[in-house]
Swiss-Prot record:
Source taxonomy: Eukaryota, Metazoa, Chordata, Craniata, Vertebrata
UniProt xrefs under Pfam families: Hormone_6
Signal peptide limits: 1-24
Cellular component aspect of the GO annotation: extracellular space; follicle-stimulating hormone complex
Any one GO molecular function term: follicle-stimulating hormone activity
Name of the protein in question: Glycoprotein hormones alpha chain
Disulfide cysteine pairs (residue numbers): C35-C59, C38-C88, C56-C110, C60-C112, C87-C115
Species annotation: Equus asinus
Chief localisation class: secreted
Gene: CGA
Superkingdom, taxonomy of origin: Eukaryota
Family indicated by similarity: Belongs to the glycoprotein hormones subunit alpha family.
Glycosylation sites (chain numbering): N80, N106
Cellular compartment(s): Secreted
Length: 120
């Protein structure tokens, strides 16, 4: 009888440790983000006006890393973390005029490039 209690205790302890480790990770740590690659996508709002309008949408490269000490010395406000990012932007486009006065850029080709507009 003591033999079975020892095995049950070991199994419960192992299960407890496993559950503790599982719950210590933030939600979504093991899942990939649901973000499509950078490509052309039809704009539903402006395409209703008769001409199909496309825009570049999707995800590109982004990362953060510790700022090298050499770079920190040249900064006006030293930062511990440096980040790099690229955004999905139009490589080529055609200017289109809708309804006589609405001017749009109809994207024809997309690629990942330097982000110019981060936050407004």
């Amino acid at each position: 009888m003591d033999y079975y209690r020892k095995h049950a205790a070991v199994i419960l302890a192992t299960l407890s440790v496993f559950l503790h480790i599982l719950h210590s990770f933030p939600d979504g740590e093991f899942t990939t983000q649901d973000c499509p690659e950078c490509k052309l996508k039809k704009n539903k709002y402006f395409s209703k006006l008769g001409v199909p309008i496309y825009q570049c949408m999707g995800c590109c490269f982004s990362r953060a890393y510790p700022t090298p000490a050499r770079s920190k010395k040249t900064m006006l406000v030293p930062k511990n973390i440096t980040s790099e990012a690229t955004c999905c932007v139009a490589k080529a486009f055609i200017r289109v005029t809708l309804m006589g006065n609405i001017r749009l850029e109809n994207h024809t080709q997309c690629y990942c490039s330097t982000c110019y507009h981060h936050k407004i």
